[in-house]
Amino acid sequence: MINKDFEPIDPAVSPRFADIATFMRTRRHDISPQVDVGLVGVPFDLGVNYRTGARHGPSGVRDGSRVIRRVHPSSGIAPFEICNVADLGDAPINPMSKDISIAQIQKFFEQLVENEIAPIACGGDH
């Protein structure tokens, strides 16, 4: 059964092309123990030269994932029925300092661990 506080936005209520994009149209939540799986952006690309752009990954994935369905068409798995999935926003970064950014990103993910949230992250240098 879907927890109504974590239910993805219904496209019959708000079309997929409308409103602010979130990962897979999940609801935006703050870090809390209620969240089982946290979808997180890491808009960071200070570690590369001449190949910037990974910082735009999270917003691109959020926008592109508007069309993802609630049930996987092949496996039949409905993740929103078995756990609380939420968009937790982006890890904080400092666009002028790689070292400060890495420390901020690490602290953000430590908060996820403290709250027993399984992170799924996109964007950033790999």
Question: Where are the model-predicted features located?
Answer:
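Metal-dependent C-N hydrolase catalytic cores
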Residues: 1-126
